[in-house]
Curated annotation (Swiss-Prot):
It holds the Pfam family Tubulin. This is Tubulin delta chain. GO terms for molecular function: GTP binding; structural constituent of cytoskeleton. GO terms for cellular component: centriole; cilium; cytoplasm; microtubule; nucleus. Belongs to the tubulin family.
Length: 451
């Protein structure tokens, strides 16, 4: 089944480019420990999901590019064309010469409705090229104007136009010390509205990705492109073909459907986070060897202690020996991270020898789901990107409670003093809308806190 990707704003277009580029690099890499037949099928499934193939063999993305300023879209199109491996459909893009000025309300209330018909027509054309539509994957920032405001509006339009299709929003969480003074307003408005329209939100935190670049990749002068490459690698590690059960004879052809079924058992819990191991520079990788037991031991502790990268894991955090009674006090003392559901994706050599029983411990999960329902394993012997062995954990858990509480608190303090509220009311977002937003997010915080 095919996925139509919608790249929204500067951030969405730059991350989208790196995402498609890494998919194509992976397609052309050595099959590693896969048979030729297996590798051929892997390539077929990847192409079917994210590209359509022209008669000449060129791969063209199933994507729509949207930005209110033309510069980034133009650069993205030309970079893809120069890659020689893939390209965008140049007729599947929309840009204007006037941005949203980092104002969510301007994007949501003005530019979104104004350009809705044109953008949705581009989406429709991509949908019509799919033999079977698996759903939509949007890539956007939470804190800006076009990506967040217009992106949120277009997400609502997608939900209205395709009510039976799955909709996954990948959102970039802003730096804690961002340059945009109203980023907290933009972020809470984005989150609360997406929660109504989207089936799930896959969240990447800029601060964490920046640390990965610095501490794990050993990059000295970190650029936005470095950050985007890490995000793209993590996304690729989810979406490239895998076997979704021990008995599976073929690679999964419905990634969004399988993902939602595994991770979103209840519409109150839609926040997904991602942990990837290993992540390191090519220089370090040349001198490193890995075994599955070591990788999975680290990944499990990252989950339990809510460590978002393998550096600096708190090994003192343990699951409670008693169910729910101890969980609250343990969380307060040691930041134990309770999960709704987890999906582990293993790729590479000797993958059949990996044991994941530790991820099925009942204390890791909320009591209203059995571990067999809450934990899912996907795998493939084909290595991904440059790693002989790699593991990804997609988690619906309490991982975002602290950053969410922080961003809501900062936004509330600004709102209580009416700071910058006039910039939103003049475009049509009134104070009542803000209050509804705070109520929605407080409910999400309460739901995850009480797991």
């Amino acid at each position: 089944m095919s996925v139509v990707t919608v790249q929204l704003g500067q951030c969405g277009n730059q991350v989208g480019y790196e995402f498609f580029d890494i998919l194509c690099s992976d397609l052309h890499s050595k099959p590693g420990h896969s048979t030729k037949r297996e590798n051929d099928y892997y390539q077929t499934v990847c192409k079917e999901q994210f590209f359509h193939e022209e008669e000449c063999g060129d791969l063209v993305t199933r994507a729509v590019l949207v930005d209110m300023e033309p510069k980034v879209v133009s650069k993205t199109l030309s970079m893809a064309g120069r890659s020689g491996k893939w390209k965008y459909d140049i007729s599947s893009q929309f840009s204007q010469k006037q941005g949203c000025g980092n104002n969510w309300a301007n994007g949501y209330c003005v530019h979104g409705p104004k350009h809705q018909d044109i953008v949705m027509d581009l989406v429709r054309k991509q949908v019509e090229k799919c033999d079977r539509l698996g759903g939509f994957f949007t890539i956007m920032s939470m804190a800006g104007g076009t990506g967040s405001g217009m992106g949120t509006f277009l997400t609502r339009c997608l939900r209205d136009a395709y009510p039976d299709s799955l909709l996954l929003n990948q959102v970039i969480w802003p730096y804690g010390t961002g340059e945009v003074i109203v980023q907290n307003y933009n972020s809470i408005l984005t989150l609360s509205h997406l929660y109504r329209s989207s089936d799930a939100l896959l969240v990447h935190e800029n601060d964490i990705i920046h640390k990965v670049c610095s501490q794990l990749m050993n990059i000295k002068q970190i650029s936005f492109r470095d950050v985007n490459k890490v995000i793209a690698h993590q996304l690729g590690s989810i979406f490239q073909p895998v076997y979704t059960s021990e008995e599976a004879l073929h690679y999964c052809r419905n990634p969004l459907g399988e993902l939602m079924e595994c991770l979103v058992p209840h519409p109150e819990y839609k926040m997904l986070g991602l942990r990837n191991i290993p992540q390191m520079s090519e220089h370090s990788l040349a001198y490193s060897t890995f075994n599955w037991n070591g990788l999975l031991k680290h990944l499990r502790q990252m989950l339990i202690a809510n460590a978002k990268m393998e550096e600096g894991i708190n090994w003192h955090v343990r699951p409670p020996s008693q169910p729910t009674a101890e969980k609250t006090s343990l969380r307060k003392e040691l930041q134990f991270n309770t999960s709704v559901a987890n999906l582990a994706i293993l790729r590479g050599k000797d993958v059949q020898t990996a044991s994941l029983e530790g991820f099925r411990d009942p204390p890791l999960y909320t009591p209203w789901l059995s571990p067999d329902d809450a934990f899912t394993l996907w795998k493939t012997p084909r290595a991904f990107n440059k790693y002989e062995k790699s593991a990804t954990l997609v988690s619906n858990s309490q991982f975002l409670l602290k950053p969410l509480d922080n961003i809501v608190g900062k936004a509330w303090n600004m709102f209580a003093s009416k700071a910058y509220v006039h910039q939103y009311t003049k475009f049509g977002i009134d104070e009542e809308e803000f209050l509804e937003t705070f109520t929605t997010l407080e409910q999400i915080i309460a739901s995850y806190t009480n797991l």
